Amino acid sequence: MNTRISALAAALLIALAAPAMSADVPQGTIKGKAWVQTDRTMAEAMAQSWTVLPASVTGDRTYEGINIRAPETKGKAPAVIFVHGSGGINPQIKAFQKRLADELVIASFTADSFQLPDRMTYTSPIDPMDYEKIHALRASELTAAVEFLAKQPWFNGRFVIAGTSEGAVAVARYVRAEAAPAEAGRIIFSWSCENNYHVVQHKTRIPDGMPVLNIMSSKDKYFSQANPYLGNHEAVGNCSKALQGNPNARIVLIKDAPHTLMNEPEAREAEDKFLKDVLLK
């Protein structure tokens, strides 16, 4: 009798506690039903990619605009392929690309995933399998972007792949196709390469010895313990575990930085050193 009462009491306490424990966890939502690019929409994602070409490439001034309207080029440059996050090509990404061209003489482009009509969008958290649909979409776009870059008349053969948040998952998981050019390095912004709510498994696939720069906020609102629905009590909030043993990996933690941080002063300093080492030497 006492055992039964204790069990019932424990169950009641758990039931009463459950709402309080989940009070800070929002209810995620999904809009849109498309998560696979067709040949046509993939071509549009590349044609409409935000492209920034240095003045040395155009022979005039820095070009900022969609790829399909880029001017005839007269020079070549190394490149950064950037994979945007869930919010698309935002002003911070455009500013990052502009700085690459003006200060480092590096070309760049960001394919536009939202050329896919009725593309799936979400507010977190949602089911991990639904996130994986988006990750598969973004992986296909990165593979296509590498193929697209190889055909650009201004491309000098050296490039880095970079991405932020949702887009950084694709960068961390990227596996080069046999016929594709090999990247010189990877930059992972605001993704921790860990198991958490955003993936079924993190599935990081970075080759041993690949130069990698991981830049994170010390308290990223999505991928650190600051997130009440992170889903991994052992997560450290950066890629240090996944990159353990890679002598060419660097982790930069920026205290109290926002989730979108590629233009923070400490981030810029780290980006410059990394890109000069892997692309400009």
Give the predicted meaning of each segment.
Residues M1-L8:
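Bacterial N-terminal signal peptides that target proteins for export
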Residues Q244-K281:
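C-terminal catalytic histidine-bearing segment of alpha/beta-hydrolase fold enzymes
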Residues G87, S113-P117, C193, D220, ...:
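Alpha/beta-hydrolase active-site loop signature
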Residues A9-A17:
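Bacterial N-terminal signal peptides
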Residues A20-A23:
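Boundary at the C-terminal end of the N-terminal hydrophobic targeting segment
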Residues G185-L253:
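The feature captures the conserved acid-bearing segment of alpha/beta-hydrolase catalytic domains
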Residues A145-I206:
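Primarily recognizes the serine-hydrolase "nucleophile elbow" in alpha/beta-hydrolase
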Residues A45-W154:
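Serine-hydrolase catalytic machinery in alpha/beta-hydrolase-like enzymes
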